[in-house]
Amino acid sequence: METIKLLNNEEFKVKDILSKMDDDSFYYGYLGKNALSSSMCKSLLESPEAYANKLKEPPKAKEPQPFRDGRLIHLLALEPHRIDELTIIDSTKGSNLYKLAVQEKPAQSVYTRSELNRCQEIADAVLENINYQELVKGAKFEIPAIANYNGLPFRGKADILLAGVVCDIKTTSDISTFKQAALLYNYDLQAALYLELFDSFEFKYVVVDKRSKEVGFFEFNDEFIESGYAKLDLATENYYKYLENKDFYDLNI
């Protein structure tokens, strides 16, 4: 596939759009609106109406702390060279220093020293794990991909990419419940999508418990992956239903 058409009908050469996807503002901003992703499928799984509502939601004034922590842990574990891009405040979020910093820079790039230290401990638990060190030998990190599935453009980034294998880092507050939570949070859909995007045959999760710092490695059976494909098919089916009724949703939602 040399070119890809986005949801807004704009067409790109795949090699050109891949080079842009390292830019977070392009990946989460422009492509967040014009390509589907595993996270956007959550509302599509519910209904076309839920997706239409999601599109019209205003940005959250305050990002949930687990999201902030997860992003910082990923950065520390996978792209530590990018830490210099962050603004670290030696004070609390309630301080004038912090409030001024988030007025001048995106909130997702401003962290307190205590947030950094806490997340560094969690990232270090992963980086210092012998099994993790063996797993990532020869791996590439934070690799973007974009491709069509059922005629629709999907985007994704592999945390860890090996030959034929995609690995994703997840954080949890209770690692003992991860397998049950995986279906609840639609990780099966993510796994199926990423196998498609990266033309791979195996998907693994590296999971770190934010409290105990325990690191676990999870693989799921074919039934889990098949469940993910079924969800992907439902999500794309509901997107086409959304398109059929887009004018109605635009006027009434």
Where are each of the predicted segments found?
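Short amphipathic alpha-helical face segments that pack within enzyme cores
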Residues: L72, L189-E196
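Metal-dependent nuclease catalytic cores that hydrolyze phosphodiester bonds in DNA/RNA
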Residues: M1-R155, I253
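Conserved catalytic cores of phosphodiester-cleaving nucleases, focusing on short active-site segments
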Residues: G156-F178, Y194
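Short histidine-centered catalytic/ligand-binding loop motif
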Residues: P59-K62, A107-Y111, S176-Y185, N221-E223
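Short, glycine/acidic-rich beta->alpha junctions
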Residues: L152, Y185-L189
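Short, structured patches in soluble enzyme cores that scaffold and shape functional sites
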Residues: I143-A145, K170-T171, V207
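Secondary-structure boundary elements
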Residues: Y132-K137, A163-V166, E196-E202
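Metal-dependent nuclease catalytic regions and adjoining charged, substrate-binding loops involved
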Residues: E2, L116, Q180-L183, L193-I253
